[in-house]
Each structure stands twice: as structure tokens, then as C-alpha cells.
Amino acid sequence: MDRKLRIGLIVVVVLALAYPAASWVIGMSVQHQLLEREGQATERLPYLAVVKRDYRRGVYSSTEEVTFGVSASVLKSLQAAGQDWGQQAQFTVRNHIHHGPLPQLRAFAPATIDTEFVLPPEAQQKLLAMIGDQAHLSIHTEMKWAGGSTTLVHSTPVKKDTPGQGGFDWRGLDVKSELGRAVGTQATEGTAPGLIVTSSQGNVSIEDLKVSTDVHQAFDELTIGKGRFSLGHLAIDAPTPVFKLDSRNLTLQVDSSVTGDFVNSGGALSMDSLEVPQFAATQLVWEVRMDHLHGPSLASLTKELRDAQAAQVRAALQSGPNDAAALAQQQLQTTQKIVTAFQTYGLQILAHDPIIEMPHIGFKTPDGDLMLSLKLEAPGLTPADVSGDPKALVAVLPQHLQATVNARIDSALLEKLLGQILPDSDKSNPVKARLQQAQDQGYIKVDGKALTTQVTFMGGQLKINGLPFAPLMAPPPPPPQAPPGKKPAPRKRKD
């Protein structure tokens, strides 16, 4: 036999014998990674708890079934939304795992995973009755040799019409998620063309939904990075009670970063247009920033809040959803833990000069514009100020608190809003009188067709437009009116 041929045969035999062993070892590593990631997920999602896990490992493939329990608060939200199958407090995730190094001879990877959701029987029946068997959801994950994974989620479009009841048109979903080697590192892109639901109770239309994230972990507990959510069009039309909503290009953006021991974060919610009964506006925006947040304290606060909520979920699953007394006791204990966490770590954040700012809040209407801004900080507070008696903190805080509020509103818009909020002139006239009194005192300024004011609190003093604030006295009552046909009595002259 040719020497090269013999060597080739030997290599093939060695590989054939070694492949099962390699696949078995890789399967053990994959199992460890999955358990670790599931533990991290439940830590970051305190509204879920693992009820049961079954992992059946083979040489070339494995199957994992994980049953999660849902918190009582989530169930109440489902019930409020009319989903009576929300009584089911559990759902199961089933993973079909194919070990590498050549899983199913379709990839060169440690493993590939195909995931499916197993709903409770009642929920499954309702879902089938709603959408039939047309829908198909695929979740495919390919793990990486250097750590991390790539997950692709695809949902097929589904359209169903029920005569006399309505229908829906789901246009599909595509998501790609990249998990990095480092814990908490993730980048996600997702798109959903839209959903249209019609029924006798109303119609809902959602178009052009997009989601993206690029985040990593900081201080072991915090998620830092960028995120964006956008919705091209949202329309709601309900006949009873009559309600209509139409919004265009809704966008939510968040961004956070770390500098030393401090976290800087911000977010902006904006809409090109919004129309609801008695109100229509364009260029709506609400920006929020929270800067110089002490990272270690914020991480500890986040962990305590998650642990409190997770403990409540575990206790609720043990006692059952129908034990009202136990659920009430669990809620009380959770509330006490949350209060304690804020008293401890929230005050530590306050002692490191945080800054809260809303630099831009506003919108435009045919009647005029509204613009607001706000900034809060309390520089100079020390850990000693916040670690003692809360009454002492209340006493010292006004000396450090610095607050500024700027407001500008067009007069015509203010007039319209007052008319909608206080349609009764007996109630609106006193408000208008107080506004005029504030204008006369310099607390409100006229800038063209708009009214402006600036409110500041510094050094324990409240000022409006730079003037020390004195509580506005109630305007004098109007003179009494004589009955029709009768002249008012003449006033007596004083000699």
C-alpha cells in the first residue's frame, strides 16, 4: 500500500475515533456555558425564576428544558390586558443542542442550538385559535470558539381574518443578537415591518418597528452602552369609549458611559407628530440626563432591587398565586427591602454630587409652542451628611440643593390648555387672575407672544426671575352685582 495512502487512512481512523470524544468534551463545556448564561439572565430579569431544569446530554447532541416561573405583577398585567391565560405562571424553553466541532456537518462551531417555547396547554390552545398553524418562529444560535454566540430569530408573516370578529396581519420579525466573550457584552439589531389588528373593540396598527443595542457590563451589575427603539407609525381607533391616537416616528434613545467611578447616562423620547382627542402636536421631545452617578453605589442599589424582586418571585411560586395573605406579606417584605436599599445606597449616590437634568421638554402646536428645562444638583453633600439621622439630612439638604426650571409657552396655547382643563369659567377665571397677578409682580415675563419664567432654588432661597418669591395672595373678589332692574345702593360718604 502506498505510504501516503496509509498515512491518510491512519489520519481518518484517528479522527473517526477522536471525534466522539471531542464532541463529548465540547458538550460538557457547552452545558456549563448554558447554565452560566441562564443564571446571569435570571439575575438580570428578577421577574423570572427557574422552576425546573432538565438537561439530557448525549455524545453528539443534547436536549435542555428549562421551566420559568413568572412573577405575580406580570400576571396581573396580563390579566389587566384581558389575557385570562395569564393565570398560567410558568412557561418552558426547550433547547435542541448539536455538539461541535462540526454540528450536523453544517458549521464549524462548538455547538448550534435551536430553541422553541413550550406554552401551557391552555395558552397553546388559545394561541392556535387566534393565529392557527400558519405562524412559525425559529431561534437558531451558533456558539463561537472564542466565547460568545450569534443568535438569529425569524418569525414568518401571518394573516388571519375571522368573519364578524376581525383579524390581524403580522408581517414578520427578524432579530440578530451577538453575545460577546465578556459577560454582559451584547449587540442586537431587530426589525418588525408591522402588525394590524381589527376587532369590534377597536383597531390597532403598528408599522416599521426597529430595535438596536450595543452594551457591556460595568461594576458587575450595570448595563452600559447605547440603545435605540423606533416606531414609524402607531394608530389606535376604539369606538367605545371613543378614542383615537395617531403618532409618527416615535423614537427612544438611551446612551450611558463610565468615567472612573462615575456613570453618565441620558435618554431622549421624541415624536414627529401626535394626535389624540383635543390635542395635536408636532416635534415632541423629552430629554433626560443623569450624570456623575457613583457607579459602585448604583451597582449595589441595582443588585439589592433585583434580589428583592427575585426573592418575591421565588416565594410567590412556592406559596401559589391564590394565597392572597402570603402574596400580601411578600409584597410588604419586598417594599421594605426596596426602601432600605434606597436609604443605604440611594443616599450614597446623593453624597457624590449627582446631576439630574431635563434639558429639553417641549412640543409645537397650531396655537403655539411649549418649552421646558430643569436641572437639579446638590453639590457639597458628604457621606457624613447622608449617613446619620434622616432628619439631619432634611435640615442640611436645602443648603446644598440647586434647582433651575425654565419655562416658555405661547399665550394662545396657554389659553387653549386652560380652556380644556378648566372649561368652567368660575374655575378658570381665578387661575387667569393669579397669572396676571404673577405677571404684574414680575414672576412671569412677556416675550412677544409668549410667557416665560425662570424658577431657581439656591442657598436655601427660592427666586422667580431673580426676584425673591412671596406667596401670591388671592386676588380681591369682584364687587357685588346688583339684581337685574335694581340700582346698587349708593356708598356712604365719610365726613
Regions found by a protein language model. Give the residues of each.
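Glycine-rich, small/hydroxylated-residue low-complexity segments
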Residues: R6-I10, V14-D495
